[in-house]
Amino acid sequence: MEPSKLFTMSDNATFAPGPVVNAADKKTFRTCFRILVLSVQAVTLILVIVTLGELVRMINDQGLSNQLSSIADKIRESATMIASAVGVMNQVIHGVTVSLPLQIEGNQNQLLSTLATIRTGKKQVSNCSTNIPLVNDLRFINGINKFIIEDYATHDFSIGHPLNMPSFIPTATSPNGCTRIPSFSLGKTHWCYTHNVINANCKDHTSSNQYISMGILVQTASGYPMFKTLKIQYLSDGLNRKSCSIATVPDGCAMYCYVSTQLETDDYAGSSPPTQKLTLLFYNDTVTERTISPTGLEGNWATLVPGVGSGIYFENKLIFPAYGGVLPNSTLGVKSAREFFRPVNPYNPCSGPQQDLDQRALRSYFPSYFSNRRVQSAFLVCAWNQILVTNCELVVPSNNQTLMGAEGRVLLINNRLLYYQRSTSWWPYELLYEISFTFTNSGQSSVNMSWIPIYSFTRPGSGNCSGENVCPTACVSGVYLDPWPLTPYSHQSGINRNFYFTGALLNSSTTRVNPTLYVSALNNLKVLAPYGNQGLFASYTTTTCFQDTGDASVYCVYIMELASNIVGEFQILPVLTRLTIT
């Protein structure tokens, strides 16, 4: 039945139907509804995705935080372990650099003390004592080759009167005799000494013998030390040894000499160096002598001369000072042709154009007196473990760091190396350098020199090279006067003025007279103590100081060549004094 078009109700109310909705309108409504539903679903999905993303991010952040926390914990653990390792490492460094050396030194001193109490009458096969051990008195062992002062403070000094002790240095026994060129070395266990005994006045190019002795420091009943001689060797074999340097070595002495029977000037004029001799003397009376030809000698040097001053035993090596004339066209001569060192005294400078002064300084290395050869300093270095096969080399410093070659001495104090160089050229002041070696197993070893500026006094000199001259010029003058440093030198600004040293100088600018004991700072003399009468002639002096660790007394032995009108031209005298430091 078809639907009714009219709805008729009671109460005579009639409802008329509204407009009929067609299909197109219905379709539009459904589309809008669906779009709305889809939009809501899309928004919901987006919100869900965003929410999930935020949840994931929060979860990840929490994981990263946990990871960072874990890493931080591990870093803290590592830092704790590193701190612990650093503490251990510091203890190791302190033990190796401080405690262990002190313990070794203490054990060494205890061992030496024990040896000093041993007496045996049985002849030993090794290089050891037969009766009295070759060991210094325990009071002195730890005060040898040590800086007496290490605080860099300002100090005052006084030099005591010479102490009366038996001389360990024999003198000439005839008016025509001559004893000259002393060389002295004091080691921790013993001392070594040598001088030349010239048969015809003091002309050392003729005929001479060599006196050598070794001994120990002992304490006398008066409380001060004495140099007790235990062994003597007198080399009288027809060889004219000259300019010998001595060094203490284990169980004995080592001596470096050269052999020549012509004038020194003739040696420089030649083209082949004279014979070089290395002599080893041990306490069991063993004497071994070798002719050596160190690496770098042949083809470079016209002559090579030992430095007279003592050498050292250092890091299993034997080191002696040397100097000589370099051949001009040799490898060494060409290499050093333009090298020179020109120190300046700021308190008394030399005036003139700098270029001219530099040229004069360069020419000073080639004195006409020595046939215009470059006069060069050097060091003879020998490996101790190969000493019997004389494996030696010449180590040559740069002339940009040293003045013209001359006699010298190598010092080892508190394990620091120093080099005294005689002021033979134009520079009138004491010449002292800090030195350091670089040794190589193959190839050429090297040495670095650092000049210590000393201006406190001058040596006597002749002609244009008197003690008053401070300008470069070519000359051969001066005299050997080595100092003994009492303090280490520091390059730190402001404290260098408290570098102190002692020795024996000749108080004249032109003549070798007036021997005087002194203590000096860099720029001024602290104490002067004249020895003998005014005008007394003297020559070479060498000084060594040490300490009695029992009562902290400081002693210095000043070995001086003094004029003698009775037994030869010179008498070598050891003057022992007590040095008071306040």
Curated annotation (Swiss-Prot):
Virion surface side: 56-582
Transmembrane segments: 35-55
Domain of life according to the entry: Viruses
Entry's Gene Ontology BP terms: symbiont entry into host cell; virion attachment to host cell
Record keywords, A-Z: Disulfide bond, Glycoprotein, Hemagglutinin, Host cell membrane, Host membrane, Host-virus interaction, Hydrolase, Membrane, Signal-anchor, Transmembrane, Transmembrane helix, Viral attachment to host cell, Viral envelope protein, Virion, Virus entry into host cell
Record-listed E.C. numbers: 3.2.1.18
Annotated site location: Binding to the glycan motifs of the host receptor: R180, K242, E264, Y323, Y369, E407, R422, R512, Y540
One Pfam family linked to the record: HN
Enzyme class, broadest EC rank: hydrolase
Glycosylation sites: N284, N329, N400, N448, N507
UniProt catalytic activity: Hydrolysis of alpha-(2->3)-, alpha-(2->6)-, alpha-(2->8)- glycosidic linkages of terminal sialic acid residues in oligosaccharides, glycoproteins, glycolipids, colominic acid and synthetic substrates
Disulfide bonds: C178-C202, C192-C253, C244-C257, C350-C471, C382-C392, C465-C475, C545-C556
Recorded GO MF terms: exo-alpha-sialidase activity; host cell surface receptor binding
Positions on the Intravirion side per record topology: 1-34
InterPro entries per the UniProt record, alphabetical: Hemagglutn-neuramid (IPR016285), Hemagglutn/HN (IPR000665), Sialidase_sf (IPR036278)
UniProt-listed Gene3D superfamilies: 1.20.5.110, 2.120.10.10
The protein's role, per its UniProt record: Attaches the virus to alpha-2,3-linked sialic acid-containing cell receptors and thereby initiating infection. Binding of HN protein to the receptor induces a conformational change that allows the F protein to trigger virion/cell membranes fusion. Binds to the glycan motifs sialyl Lewis (SLe) and GM2 ganglioside (GM2-glycan).
Record's comment describing the protein's domains: The C-terminus (head domain) is involved in binding the cellular receptor.
Subunit details: Homotetramer; composed of disulfide-linked homodimers. Interacts with F protein trimer.
Protein name, UniProt field: Hemagglutinin-neuraminidase
